[in-house]
Swiss-Prot record:
Residues 865-878 have a biased composition (Polar residues). The modification Phosphotyrosine is found at residues 653, 753. One of its GO terms (cellular component) is plasma membrane. This is Putative leucine-rich repeat receptor-like serine/threonine-protein kinase At2g14440. It catalyses: L-seryl-[protein] + ATP = O-phospho-L-seryl-[protein] + ADP + H(+); L-threonyl-[protein] + ATP = O-phospho-L-threonyl-[protein] + ADP + H(+). It is a single-pass type I membrane protein. Residues 581-850 form the Protein kinase domain. The keyword Metal-binding does not apply. InterPro entries: Kinase-like_dom_sf, Leu-rich_rpt, LRR_dom_sf, Malectin-like_Carb-bd_dom, Prot_kinase_dom, Protein_kinase_ATP_BS, Ser-Thr/Tyr_kinase_cat_dom, Ser/Thr_kinase_AS. Residues 24-528 are extracellular. The active site is at residue 705.
Length: 886
């Protein structure tokens, strides 16, 4: 007995009536029939009497598919008439309310049934929270085409996300989800969760056993082998009070070797030789032994001796391997051999096999998950990425949400929330206060009403608060001054009254703020507040602007061509001819004129010479020169100088060795194809250039002609925005748009701008969204040979099929990360929203594109790490911040 206690874990007792009653009442059971319409009554499965409800309230996306033919399928006795499939997005998640710390049997079922008529078995990944559970391959099995995945898992929080993740060209689908609570002291692994390999009971009856015979709805599959003989009894066998409770139909049957001198051997295959496996062996002596009969046998697992064992008479026991097993070559074996004392052969009634699966990534902080999902529910945020864990894995993080992910064992925290231009209505929800680690909160450009709530003072880590361009009322609250880290507050474009509180003014005028650890911060940490203070102040500002405008207008009348600043950049026409070698090499042509190649002080330059036939020539020339003389940004093309002599007008730019983006996407440039990280880098840098025009210039500027031909590429494929002849400035504050004649390029024009002649910075966002579609797809903006000639309509039609490969540029040869590309595509579609108020600003666009690149790099590093781990020695990988062109 001492040896037994050391080598085996023992579970033995009488049958638990209480446990049986609870389970038969389906207490704690969750049974979802996926695809069942919400207006239909719950389905009661006739064989088990289990009640299945529609999954509509547990998942946001997906569509119902109808099984073509299931008349010849008896797949675990479940209904298979409909299913749910997910043609949109990359990750689609079910969100289930569970009890934290509870051990559940979680079962997912996938029955394809050729619902789509394609006869192509789907393949995709299945995630439990932020961790991958398994890769699902729904292939034909035993005359059907179904797969069951089952796991025993202890929930970490009170929300459980089960996610289907698209990995290729096929569409994820699911038929049913089942959760069954288990006793806390059953199925215990030292680490990780337990993935079911098999539940066998030894009989040749052919009968599957499950609920209600099994109180936990385990599915027991009958199993026999040619060298075995089955025995059984009609007498009841006592069960367990501590949790395992095998059904009577399972424990009342057993197998013995037909040749009583031979051992009883059971083998199974592990998925990998590195897998850790637990075996649960069920025994009960079910024969009435004579006085001179004895059944005793040795138990060996993978050739290792464990115990000499005698089954109890009509009383069940479960013997569990005390530590996880590893099976050499992937072949595992349990062998029962009778001892010299035994007169009867060994027997076994049933066996369960589980492999250990690790879920190392911690879920996002529970309180913050609840808060962000309440925010989502309150404002009806319908972003497709807002499913599952908001922070991890990073490639699926929610758009507009940034997190602090320290390591896999520490729950991530939400540190930034950007819901700008998201169509939010109502008051500022109190749920935001539960995101206690927020550093940045952007609720700008919505239709929020009410006062700035006191609950925001609980955001003690907040550095930047943007509430601009809403319909907020009341006074600027004094409590904002108590948020010590707060650096910037944006309040313009609201209906706030009164003056700025003295406490905020004191902080604004203070040369040093007392922050953490009693240290002082420099003046750059002061709070900047932009708010409507009084009608008098506004009136004064308007009068001053009118006065300045009239003076400028008067000055314009006096001087037909006003002199330009920084005359040291002004060149004579003869110098222009000399630097271009008498206009020898043409780089390009446009409505403005011709661009020539030139040299200035042995440096290459591009010289744009204005055509005298250009209708708006000098006006656009003047606009571009004045803009480029006062703005300087690494992602805006630099002006070297200009010529303004009579009718001879020219602009001299820095030379961009690799031409424009469109040449590379179309293949007209020749040479290697831009790879995926290279395209993302170009998109990021272009976005930063536009962002600078919108928020870095004083006054802000709208480019008005963002397109792929106006994105130039340097020697190392660094991107710079060019051609500012159509740019317009707009005022900040209450002014939301500039009324102007429509100008720009067909295909890139914001439909709202085109229809209303209203120009805003969101017009550039729309145009950039078109460029982003070009970058992703490699398709021209307008192509008459396509069924859908306009790239926007074409992209929407392809998205309806949910096939990323059909959308991505074929020249990439599938060499891209699916998660990164889906995120970029979703961002592009957000940018081209017909309503400008629902488009993101360029700051957010640049941020999301950076995340796309981070996701790609992370996936690449993981792949490299996996490859390097297979070889000896150390490998150092350098990740360049300048992706190369291939």
């Amino acid at each position: 007995m001492e040896t037994r206690s050391k080598l085996m874990l023992l579970a033995c007792a009488t049958f638990s009536i209480i446990s049986l009653v609870k389970s038969q009442n389906q207490q704690g059971f969750i049974s979802l029939y996926c695809g069942l319409p919400s207006n239909e009554s719950p389905y009661i499965e006739p064989l088990t009497n289990l009640t299945y409800i529609s999954d509509v309230n547990f998942v946001r996306g997906g569509k119902t598919g109808n099984i073509k033919n299931n008349s010849d399928i008896d797949f675990t006795s479940r209904p298979y008439k409909v299913l749910r499939y997910f043609p949109e997005g990359i990750r689609n998640c079910y969100s289930l309310s569970v009890k934290q710390g509870t051990k559940y049997l979680i079962r997912t079922l996938f029955f394809y049934g050729n619902y789509d008529g394609l006869n192509t078995s789907p393949r995709f990944d299945l995630f439990l929270g932020p961790n991958i559970w398994t890769s699902v391959d729904v292939q034909k099995v035993d005359g059907g085409d179904g797969v069951i995945e089952e796991i025993i898992h202890v929930t970490r929080c009170n929300i459980l996300d089960i996610c289907l993740v698209k990995t290729g060209t096929t569409t994820p689908m699911i038929s049913a989800i089942e959760l069954r609570p288990l006793r806390y002291d059953t199925y215990t692994a030292r680490t990780g969760s337990l993935k079911k390999i098999l539940h066998f009971y030894f009989t040749n009856s052919g009968k599957e056993v499950r609920y209600p015979e099994d109180v936990y709805d385990r599915v027991w599959i009958p199993h026999s082998q040619p060298e075995w003989t089955q025995i059984n009894t009609t007498r009841n066998v006592s069960g367990f009070s501590d949790g395992y409770n095998p059904p009577q139909d399972v424990i009342k049957t057993a197998s013995i070797p037909t040749n009583v001198s031979e051992p009883l051997t059971f083998t199974w295959m592990s998925e990998s030789s590195d897998d850790e496996t637990y075996a649960y062996l069920y025994f009960a002596e079910i024969q009435q032994l004579k006085a001179n009969e004895t059944r005793q046998f040795k138990i060996l697992v993978n050739g290792v001796y464990y115990i000499d064992y005698i089954p109890r008479k009509f009383e069940a026991e479960t013997l569990i391997t005390p530590a996880a097993l590893k099976c050499g070559g992937g072949v595992c074996r349990v062998q029962l051999s009778k001892t010299p004392k035994s007169t009867l052969p060994p027997q076994m009634n049933a066996i369960e096999i589980f492999s250990v699966i690790q879920f190392p990534q911690s879920d996002t902080n529970t309180d913050e998950v609840i808060a962000i999902k309440n925010i989502q529910s309150t404002y009806k945020v319908s972003r497709i990425s807002w499913q599952g864990d908001p922070c991890v894995p990073i490639q699926f993080s929610w758009m507009g949400v940034s997190c602090n992910v320290i390591d896999i064992s520490t729950p991530p925290r939400i540190i930034s929330l950007d819901l700008s231009s998201s169509g939010l209505t109502g008051v500022i929800t109190p749920s935001i206060q539960n995101l206690t680690m927020l550093r940045e909160l952007d609720l700008s450009n919505n239709n929020l009403t009410g006062v700035i709530p006191p609950s925001l003072q609980n955001l003690t880590m907040l550095r930047e608060l943007d509430l601009s361009n809403n319909n907020l009322t009341g006074e600027v609250p004094e409590f904002l001054a108590t948020i010590k880290p707060l650096l910037v507050i944006h309040l313009r474009g609201n209906n706030l009254r009164g003056s700025v509180p003295q406490a905020l003014q004191d902080r604004e005028n203070n040369d040093g703020l007392k922050l953490l650890r009693g240290k002082h911060q420099p003046k750059s940490w002061l709070v900047a507040i932009v708010a409507s203070i009084s009608c008098v102040a506004v009136t004064i500002i308007v009068l001053v602007l009118i006065f300045i405008f009239r003076r400028r207008k008067s000055s314009t009348r006096k001087v037909i061509r006003p002199s330009l600043e920084m005359k040291n950049r002004r060149f004579k026409y003869s110098e222009v001819k000399e630097m271009t070698n008498n206009f020898e090499v043409v780089l390009g042509k446009g409505g403005f004129g011709v661009v020539y190649h030139g040299f200035l002080n042995n440096e290459q330059v591009a010289v744009k010479v204005l055509s005298q036939s250009s209708t708006q020539g000098y006006k656009e020339f003047k606009t571009e020169v004045e803009l480029l003389l006062r703005v300087h940004h690494v992602n805006l093309v630099s002006l070297v100088g200009y010529c303004d002599k009579g009718n001879d007008l020219a602009l001299i730019y820095e030379f961009m060795e690799n031409g424009n983006l469109k040449e590379h996407l179309s293949g007209k440039r020749g040479g290697p194809v831009l790879n995926w990280p290279g395209r993302l880098k170009i998109a990021i840098e272009s976005a930063l250039g536009i962002e600078y025009l919108h928020i870095g210039c004083k006054p802000p500027m709208v480019h008005r002609d963002v397109k792929s031909t106006n994105i130039l590429l340097g020697l190392r494929f660094e991107a710079k925005l060019a051609d500012f002849g159509l740019s317009r400035s707009f005022l900040v504050g209450s002014q939301t748009h500039v009324s102007t004649n429509v100008a720009g390029t067909l295909g890139y024009l914001d439909p709202e701008y085109y229809q209303k002649n209203w120009l805003t910075e969101k017009s550039d966002v729309y145009s950039f969204g078109i460029v982003l579609l070009e970058i992703i797809t490699g398709q021209p903006v307008i192509e008459q040979s396509r069924d859908k000639s306009y790239i926007v309509e074409w992209a929407k039609s392809m998205l309806a099929n949910g096939d990323i490969e059909s959308i991505m540029d074929r020249n990439l040869h599938q060499d891209y990360d699916t998660s990164s590309s889906w995120k970029a595509l979703e961002l592009a579609m957000l940018c081209i929203n017909p309503s400008s108020t629902l488009r993101p600003n360029m700051t957010r666009v640049a941020h999301e594109l950076n995340e796309c690149l981070e996701i790609y790099n992370l996936t690449k590093r993981r792949s490299q790490d996996q490859n390097s781990s297979k070889s000896s020695g150390h490998t150092v990988t350098f990740i360049s911040d300048i992706p190369s062109a291939r």
